[in-house]
Amino acid sequence: ARATRTIAETCNGIIACLWEYYVSYQPGFPEKTAFIPLPIDLRKVTSRVRCVPEKLNFFIGIQSARSNLKGTDVMLPVLQEVQRKHPDLCRITEVHDVPYARYQQLMDDADVQLDQLYSYTPSMNSLLAMAKGVTVVGGGEPENYEILNETELRPIINVLPDEQDIYKKLEEIVLHKERIPELSAQSVAYVAK
């Protein structure tokens, strides 16, 4: 904490790429804190708006050393419970500790990605998923849209760090998979902005 404060005090500017960082630094350093969203080069991403899938493909990437930080340790068992209840409507692509290039490749066939349970905003993995047209379940709080001045698009299925809320939102998208094309299109548009 002391090193962070020293760096913040002595640097010329603080670029916050997520809402969480902005609200952490802006009160103490308002004159030097600026919000600049994470950049996604859409020329390097193949975007594909998803159709209504016959069987919804959920994607969850797990880094064993960080599972409790990202919330996948909470989301995976809930997702598995939804899949057990609706085996004909959804499936799970679960990947563990794979290199990033392979992770991105495996995500290409997903309809929905689960990531960042404890975040208010999507981070790099979620933004790349959205750029591909994959719907994200994770952090999508109102503050995320407000800092971007986004008043129309709401592509992220926001979940609270609560198993009942996660279950409800996952089951809802399984039972209403006709929403996937709209959420997919909004995801691509959100990243393009």
Kindly label every feature range from the protein language model.
Residues 172, 179-192:
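A short, well-ordered alpha-helix in the C-terminal region of glycosyltransferases
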Residues 104, 126-131, 145-146:
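Short alpha-helical segment that forms part of, or immediately flanks, the ligand-binding pocket
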Residues 58, 76-104:
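A conserved nucleotide-sugar
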Residues 135-142:
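Short hydrophobic beta-strand element within catalytic cores of glycosyltransferases
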Residues 36, 40, 44-70, 76:
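Conserved donor-binding/catalytic core segment of Leloir-type glycosyltransferases
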Residues 108-121, 134:
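Acidic donor-binding loop of glycosyltransferase active sites
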Residues 1-14:
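Membrane-proximal helix-turn-helix segments that form the acceptor-binding/catalytic region
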